[in-house]
Amino acid sequence: MFLLTLKDRKDDGAYAVQNRHGDKVLFLFEEEDDAVRYALQLEEQEDTEMEVVEVDGELAIKTCKLYNYKYAVITPNDIVIPPKLNDNFSKN
């Protein structure tokens, strides 16, 4: 699996998105191509360089569960795009 970090700042942790409830969700991509595509969209939108990092999927999921982090496994059949900056989600 693959996740995203800020380029040259892996120690700052993985990139996560905020869901409509305000919780951060870590995206774990099954395919590197999908992670790269998402990273390019982020770079264009946020003017920040991202890096795609390969991780052991089972270990990443176990770690998320251990620390009660939310995560989503992004399969090749999923379509995800970065949320626009300052997007407001309906609380309903």
What does each model-identified segment do?
Residues M1-N92:
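Conserved NAD+-utilizing ADP-ribose enzyme module
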